[in-house]
């Protein structure tokens, strides 16, 4: 299987399955001498881990990372950083009835057709459980970005039809972690939680939008033409499970605005009066805030009967068991941040070769 690596210079490889012994990763290209803050790494994992509230899956995983290499006396050595996270609370028997039946809108069908075999236990490699490794790597990338005063903040801005249109500059982003939904609008958060709980009781699921803001990115980060910064961010976001939409800057709204109103006019200090460009022009960062939206579909695993087919193309009814997220967005916030950090730091390293 190809496609398990991400990045060019700061390169991450992940491995493992949802119900296997462990998941893990290898980070290659991390500079030596970084004093790792393990508490921050664990905090990022806790933000992603299951069982943290009533509105996410009740699978209980400690998500404790075990580092195997690349670290000595708390400092990175410059060699590959290897790590694993053991799976401790998987009920594979809940999936036995899915052994020969395809779950609608899952990867069951496509994986089986491509490889001729599939791990039906929790989706195997295609499970969002894989993202735990991304969060570990992203947490280290965030610590490296902090050296350059670059900070990444993501939050839930929409669940179903519940959303707010406030610009991120008008929000108190320090409130993101004050509610389990990870939305900075406390009143809207309460409505979102109530809505998700009602969806869950009906055995259904719902999607939404995560907004991400990146501050203090230096001018000129990214590569022209095929490796534009927004293209790299888009690829990163679209690689996350359940993501269907990536929209940066003015996005679809910008298609309805005249150029005379949409152009970002420069000021005397090399900033712009507006930021419809989303902090990126010509594929390179322009020093303004980078911001984008990531749209998540409703989780495909619902707890109601559905029509499907088996591997012999006979019609079947399917009823999924197990513990699943009615809405992935609260746990996806740190994943969006992690993938953003991986893109940014990889491009920061690459940018060093252009000037003496």
Curated annotation (Swiss-Prot):
Q: What role is this protein assigned?
A: This reaction introduces a second double bond into the aromatic ring system.
- Please report which protein family the annotation says this sequence is part of: Belongs to the chorismate synthase family.
Residues in a coiled coil are none
Q: Which Pfam families match?
A: Chorismate_synt (PF01264)
Disulfide bond sites:
none
Cofactors (names): FMNH2
Q: What is this protein called?
A: Chorismate synthase
**Pathway, per record:** Metabolic intermediate biosynthesis; chorismate biosynthesis; chorismate from D-erythrose 4-phosphate and phosphoenolpyruvate: step 7/7
Instruction: List the EC numbers from the record.
Output: 4.2.3.5
Keyword set, alphabetical order: Amino-acid biosynthesis, Aromatic amino acid biosynthesis, FAD, Flavoprotein, FMN, Lyase, NADP
What is its quaternary makeup?
Homotetramer.
The record's catalysed reaction(s) read: 5-O-(1-carboxyvinyl)-3-phosphoshikimate = chorismate + phosphate
Task: Kindly report, in one word, the top-level EC class recorded for this enzyme.
Answer: lyase
Q: Which SUPFAM superfamilies match?
A: Chorismate synthase, AroC
Question: In the UniProt record, which is one GO cellular component term?
Answer: cytosol
The residues that the entry says bind NADP(+) are 48
**GO biological process terms held by the UniProt record:** amino acid biosynthetic process; aromatic amino acid family biosynthetic process; chorismate biosynthetic process
The protein's matches in NCBIfam families, at most eight in alphabetical order, are given as: aroC, PRK05382.1
Q: Where does FMN bind?
A: 125-127, 241-242, 282, 297-301, 323
UniProt-recorded Gene Ontology molecular function terms: chorismate synthase activity; FMN binding
Question: In the UniProt record, what gene is named as encoding this protein?
Answer: aroC
Q: How is the cofactor bound?
A: Reduced FMN (FMNH(2)).
């Amino acid at each position: 299987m190809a496609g398990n690596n991400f990045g060019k210079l700061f390169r991450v490889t992940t491995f493992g399955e949802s119900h296997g012994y462990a998941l893990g990763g290898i980070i290659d290209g991390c500079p030596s001498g970084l004093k790792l803050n393990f508490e921050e790494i664990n905090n990022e994992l806790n933000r992603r881990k299951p069982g943290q509230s009533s509105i996410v899956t009740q699978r209980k995983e400690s998500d404790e990372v075990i580092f195997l290499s690349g670290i000595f006396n708390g400092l990175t050595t410059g060699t590959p950083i290897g790590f694993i996270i053991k799976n401790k609370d998987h009920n594979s028997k809940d999936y036995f009835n899915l052994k020969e039946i395809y779950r609608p809108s899952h990867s069951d069908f496509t994986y089986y057709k491509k490889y001729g075999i599939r791990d039906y236990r929790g989706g195997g490699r295609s499970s969002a459980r894989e993202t735990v490794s991304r969060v570990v790597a992203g947490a280290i990338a965030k610590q490296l970005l902090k050296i350059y005063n670059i900070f990444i903040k993501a939050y839930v801005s929409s669940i179903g039809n519940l959303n707010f249109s406030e610009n991120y500059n008008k929000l108190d982003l320090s409130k993101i972690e004050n509610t389990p939904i990870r939305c900075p609008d406390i009143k809207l958060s309460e409505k979102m939680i109530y809505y998700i709980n009602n969806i869950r009781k009906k055995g259904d699921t719902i999607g939404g939008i995560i907004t991400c803001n990146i501050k203090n990115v230096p001018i000129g980060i990214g590569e022209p033409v095929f490796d534009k910064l927004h293209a790299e961010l888009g690829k990163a976001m679209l690689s996350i499970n359940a993501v269907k939409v990536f929209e940066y800057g003015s996005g679809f709204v910008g298609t309805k605005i005249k150029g005379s109103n949409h152009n970002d006019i420069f000021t005397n200090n090399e900033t712009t009066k507006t930021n419809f460009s989303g902090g990126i022009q010509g594929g390179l960062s322009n020093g303004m805030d980078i911001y984008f939206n990531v749209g998540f579909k409703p989780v495909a695993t619902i707890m109601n009967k559905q029509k499907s087919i088996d591997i012999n193309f006979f019609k079947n009814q399917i009823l999924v068991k197990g513990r699943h997220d009615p809405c992935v967005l609260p746990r996806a916030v740190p994943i969006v941040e992690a993938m953003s950090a991986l893109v940014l730091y990889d491009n920061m390293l690459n940018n060093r070769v252009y000037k003496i």
